[in-house]
UniProtKB/Swiss-Prot annotation:
Subcellular location as annotated: Cytoplasm, Cytosol; Membrane; Cytoplasmic vesicle, Autophagosome membrane; Cytoplasm, Perinuclear region
Outcome when changing residue 17 to F: No change in autophagosome targeting under fed condition. Decreased autophagosome targeting under starved condition
Binding site for GTP: 19-21, 40, 66, 121, 123, 156
Listed name of the protein: Ras-related protein Rab-24
Residues the record lists as Phosphotyrosine modifications: 17, 172
Membrane topology: Lipid-anchor
The protein's Enzyme Commission number: 3.6.5.2
Region (Switch II): 63-80
NCBIfam families given in the database record: small_GTP (TIGR00231)
UniProt activity-regulation remark: Regulated by guanine nucleotide exchange factors (GEFs) which promote the exchange of bound GDP for free GTP. Regulated by GTPase activating proteins (GAPs) which increase the GTP hydrolysis activity. Inhibited by GDP dissociation inhibitors (GDIs).
Length: 203
């Protein structure tokens, strides 16, 4: 399997305004856009190529709408996902409760999907610790219970963003190394949505 290309479908889930799009912008474009984002309708797609060992990994990232009215549509996008980054706002306790909803959805519909819990806007806590509304230890206990990994991130400063996506890729490659793969089972990069590709592999 040396030098094999690996495609991984990754879905971003979470309540609206938790910062899913900002997270993707920071990872793919290494930028933080100031000002209000236009709400995602349905889902936005972007792909980024990276290297894990001697493998070329393409993360196909689906940034789904957080509004409850798009719930049914979101299910279309996370079908077949190998990894899900479930986001919540560290300053909004209701967003963590909403994250639990998405975890239940994934567990019932995509049992093989690896879940990563992602607390966002950690920079706001650096400014004022009293703004925290989601206790780290409570989330860690929950993550342990559902066998998920936990990251607290800031799209503004870039804290732990690259580490999160790197871990997603490394975990999938590790799992793939123990499986007999006769064909690509990752994201179909020909799907509609005007895919854009960004590479961080350098030869």
């Amino acid at each position: 399997m040396s030098g094999q290309r690996v495609d991984v479908k990754v879905v971003m889930l979470g309540k609206e305004y938790v910062g899913k799009t900002s997270l993707v912008e920071r990872y793919v474009h290494d930028r933080f856009l100031v000002g209000p984002y236009q709400n995602t309708i349905g889902a936005a797609f972007v792909a980024k190529v990276m290297c894990v060992g001697d493998r070329t990994v393409t993360l196909g990232i689906w940034d789904t709408a957080g509004s409850e009215r798009y719930e049914a549509m979101s299910r279309i996008y996370y079908r077949g996902a190998k990894a899900a980054i479930v986001c919540y706002d560290l300053t909004d306790s209701s967003s963590f409760e909403r994250a639990k909803f998405w975890v239940k959805e994934l567990r019932s519909l995509e049992e093989g999907c690896q879940i990563y819990l992602c607390g966002t806007k950690s920079d706001l806590l650096e400014e004022d610790r009293r703004r925290r509304r989601v206790d780290f230890h409570d989330v860690q206990d929950y993550a342990d219970n559902i066998k998920a990994q936990l990251f607290e991130t800031s799209s503004k400063t870039g804290q732990s963003v690259d580490e999160l996506f790197q871990k997603v890729a490394e975990d999938y490659v590790s799992v793939a190394a123990f499986q007999v793969m006769t064909e690509d089972k990752g994201v179909d990069l020909s799907q509609k949505a005007n895919p854009y590709f960004y590479s961080c592999c350098h030869h």
